[in-house]
Amino acid sequence: MLQQKQSLLEHKPVLSKELEKLVNHYRTLSLNGQCAQYIPALREANQTYLGLYVVHSNGIEIKSGDWQVPFTLQSISKIINFIAACLDRGITYVLDRVDVEPTGDPFNSMVRLEMRKTGKPFNPMINAGAITVASLLSGKSPTEKLESVYSLVEKMLGRRASANEAVFHSEWQTAHRNRSLAYYLKDTGYLESEVDDALHVYFTLCAIEVATKDIAKIGLILANNGYDPLSHQQIFPKEVAKLTKALMLTCGMYNASGTFAAHIGIPAKSGVSGGIMAAVPARGRSDEAMGIGIYGPAIDDFGNSVAGVALLKHLSHMWDLSIF
């Protein structure tokens, strides 16, 4: 199957047409979901959008559908937030304040957090963990903390990222559950900055605007253990990349992560804006690692893109991408 994948890459025009058919086919599944309703600015997206971008270590890029449509990272930013914090403070320091265990609960749930004796967030991929991690970034002010992340993104993408102000303000004004999480974390001693400062950083990261090409590139770097094969630079250490991919596999698709791992088997992270970032490691010398970026704003009850997950499942089976 790996040879088949390479053969497909050698016939890029044919593959592009096949992927266009797949995108158009799975686009119809968007009707089975809806755009995120609890963030007003996200309700306005066209729920029939579906875009795909695939980038390989050898430089081959394949795109299809609405791949150029901009969207905000939302929870995909938790990956970058975690990496930046590990670079700033070290893995040990970060993991002293946030765990690596799946929860099986909704991403914004407080239930298990309150039941846990220590109050330590379960993992960096849920809101409580991500808000905690945002408070760990180096710098005193939100602006200084955000610079750690913006600098990392610039190294990965080769350009300066920016946040969508309308989305940021939309989230800030409706942040009641996240505020309660942050105050609880402050009370238990895990939040290292003031509540409003941590939330400002967190919501700004969620509002960073990207397209499928951008998250595919970040996925490629993760797939190559922090190394960018296109710029030939080690962006972050292998240890950080491996830990991040483990978290993506076990916690990256909200409380559908187990099903996703069993049936698709790729380290991935989703966001309620409809984005999915996947990192496909190489499995031998003759194989090429790849990053996959998908955007489909109609999401299911778990917060994952309906059409995006179905499309990624098809690609995983067609190209034998599962790491298992």
Swiss-Prot record:
GO molecular function: glutaminase activity
Class in the EC hierarchy, top level: hydrolase
Any Pfam family matching the protein: Glutaminase
One Gene Ontology biological process: glutamine catabolic process
Catalysed conversion reaction: L-glutamine + H2O = L-glutamate + NH4(+)
EC number(s) from the headed UniProt entry: 3.5.1.2
Signal peptide limits: none
Keywords: Hydrolase
Residues reported to bind substrate: S75, N127, E171, N178, Y202, Y254, V272
Family from the record: Belongs to the glutaminase family.
PANTHER family, per database record: GLUTAMINASE (PTHR12544), GLUTAMINASE 1 (PTHR12544:SF32)
Subunit structure: Homotetramer.
Protein name: Glutaminase 2
Species of origin: Halalkalibacterium halodurans (strain ATCC BAA-125 / DSM 18197 / FERM 7344 / JCM 9153 / C-125) (Bacillus halodurans)
Gene: glsA2
